Amino acid sequence: MRDETPEQPAPLRFGYTTGSCATATSLAAARLLLGGRADDAVEIVLPKGQRVMMRLEFCRTTAAGAEAGTIKDAGDDPDVTHGALVFARVALSAAPGVRFHAGPGVGTVTRAGLTLPIGEPAINPVPRQMMTTHLDALAAEHGYTGGFDVTIGVEGGEALALKTMNPRLGIVGGLSILGTTGIVRPFSCAAYIASIHQGIDVARANGIAHIAACTGNASEDAMRAHYGLPDIALIEMGDFAGAVLKHLRRAPLARVSMCGGFGKLSKLAAGHLDLHSRHSSIDLPLLAQWAADAGASDALQAAMRAANTSQEALKLALADGVPLGDIVCAHALRVARDIVPASVAVEMFAIDRQGRFVGSAR
């Protein structure tokens, strides 16, 4: 086979959060009301001081005030809102201050445990502060002493929200307006990890003492059937086992069950906290060594090292009477126990590709 010269990858492109989109559009709409200026782009200042220019799809007056919209660009790590129209409708008010409202496609908080009170629009604290800072500065520039009513919406947001964890978190009717830095960093997965933390916090605030952190749908179904847990207690951790364990170290619960496919659990057992293939791989020689520690023959060890997949290695071990699923779960449990406080009861479950339990440890 001839060698090929690998192409040099282009730098990954950053994007902007829905919070940045909301800030840009609310500022543009308010500027139209106070200054009579309809811009096709607007500059905003991000929380860490960077200045960015965001293009607008429209900026126009309405019967109640003004509105502006922009297309959410998540850069080279597109999320569920990538390409969606985020818009702001702004009305002036005699009462000072900035009041936020959920427009079409933006959800409302209905459960305790989030950073916002029940009944509030799901516009997170940092985006609220970004909008308030920009609107206050605009008001001062124009000598305006009144306030602003700001309604944020996302076109199609109610349907998009069904692809997120919002329904499980108790955010109904649409998406959340998010962001802590204003920037979407490619493959940072910050939003996903934040949703894991929120899921744990919401469960705790609603009196749930036992959660199950699951790598996917099959493991979630297995935990739901095994324990009869409500959806609010089921945490979709994906590949981010470390996000669950480290959050529990900071904010413990009474009990956590972790469940995943055998291959994923074997990565955790080997000490990897990010189970994605970009960051960790299945170590067949290590599985063979663990089998050897349990009395596996030399022939079985060799067959396991030569296996094509972890599932094949598991099948070989079980056929020879070696409880590899339990062994892997026991090692994964030790990794977890090194992170979470002793007050947290931890247990591990491994499933096969049919969703059947093939190992456990507690």
From Swiss-Prot:
Q: Which GO terms describe its biological process?
A: anaerobic cobalamin biosynthetic process; methylation
Pfam families assigned: CbiD
Q: Which UniProt keywords apply?
A: Cobalamin biosynthesis, Methyltransferase, S-adenosyl-L-methionine, Transferase
Domain of life the protein comes from? Bacteria
**What InterPro entries has UniProt attached to this entry?**
CbiD, CbiD_sf
Enzymatic reactions: Co-precorrin-5B + S-adenosyl-L-methionine = Co-precorrin-6A + S-adenosyl-L-homocysteine
EC class, as a word, reads transferase
Look up the EC number in the record and give it. Answer: 2.1.1.195
The protein's GO terms of the molecular function aspect are: cobalt-precorrin-5B C1-methyltransferase activity
In terms of Gene3D superfamilies, this protein maps to:
CbiD-like
Its UniProt pathway annotation is:
Cofactor biosynthesis; adenosylcobalamin biosynthesis; cob(II)yrinate a,c-diamide from sirohydrochlorin (anaerobic route): step 6/10
Q: Which family does it belong to?
A: Belongs to the CbiD family.
PANTHER family named in the record: COBALT-PRECORRIN-5B C(1)-METHYLTRANSFERASE (PTHR35863:SF1)
What is the protein's given name? Answer: Cobalt-precorrin-5B C(1)-methyltransferase
Taxonomic lineage: Bacteria, Pseudomonadati, Pseudomonadota, Betaproteobacteria, Burkholderiales
